[in-house]
Amino acid sequence: MAEEKQKPRMKVHYVGVIRKILQEKFHYKNEMQIPRVDKIVINMGIGEATSDSKKPSIAAGDLSLITGQKAVVTYASSSIAGFKVREGMPLGAKVTLRKDRMFEFLDRLVTIALPRVRDFRGLNPKSFDGRGNFAMGIKEHIVFPEINYDKVDQIWGMDIIVCTTAKTDDEARELLRAFNFPFRS
């Protein structure tokens, strides 16, 4: 008999609680209009990649540990002489998370990683792009429990973009607030 896979905690919370909260607040005509998290894109830009081309692959390995999905090394699309960057040079790593892995990462981000950030005063509520997507940055990738602090030789930052199906920033803000994102007041 096949084992039934356990659903992510945040997904169960979204389906059971968050959808009802958003429906009551915004009075959607159709159930499909209720905003949901579409995908999460995590990007690490490695500044030292110009001098050492192995660093982006190390960063991709760390990003794979954090997300549970293989990271892709990103390359320069054009040459920029001022930054000593040539076209095709490896510059960083990125991962796009969807479905269950996305909800699992969201859970770890809100409950474990953000409370471990030094001098954390809350997320900026103005970091929305006008179309319901939220972007944030973390200065140290070691706040995630999957990274062994003793084995890390260099600390990198990362950009986290949460893409939602919300039409406005207010809808997206309420969606993420329901997911317990700690916004500044």
Curated annotation (Swiss-Prot):
Gene3D superfamilies associated with the record: 3.30.1440.10
One term under GO cellular component: ribosome
Recorded name of the encoding gene: rplE
Protein family membership: Belongs to the universal ribosomal protein uL5 family.
Gene Ontology BP annotations: translation
Function per UniProt: This is one of the proteins that bind and probably mediate the attachment of the 5S RNA into the large ribosomal subunit, where it forms part of the central protuberance. In the 70S ribosome it contacts protein S13 of the 30S subunit (bridge B1b), connecting the 2 subunits; this bridge is implicated in subunit movement. Contacts the P site tRNA; the 5S rRNA and some of its associated proteins might help stabilize positioning of ribosome-bound tRNAs.
Organism listed in the record: Bartonella bacilliformis (strain ATCC 35685 / KC583 / Herrer 020/F12,63)
Protein name, entry field: Large ribosomal subunit protein uL5
Superkingdom in the source lineage: Bacteria
Lineage of source species: Bacteria, Pseudomonadati, Pseudomonadota, Alphaproteobacteria, Hyphomicrobiales
Classification via Pfam families: Ribosomal_L5, Ribosomal_L5_C
Entry keyword set: Ribonucleoprotein, Ribosomal protein, RNA-binding, rRNA-binding, tRNA-binding
GO MF, any single term: rRNA binding
Subunit structure: Part of the 50S ribosomal subunit; part of the 5S rRNA/L5/L18/L25 subcomplex. Contacts the 5S rRNA and the P site tRNA. Forms a bridge to the 30S subunit in the 70S ribosome.
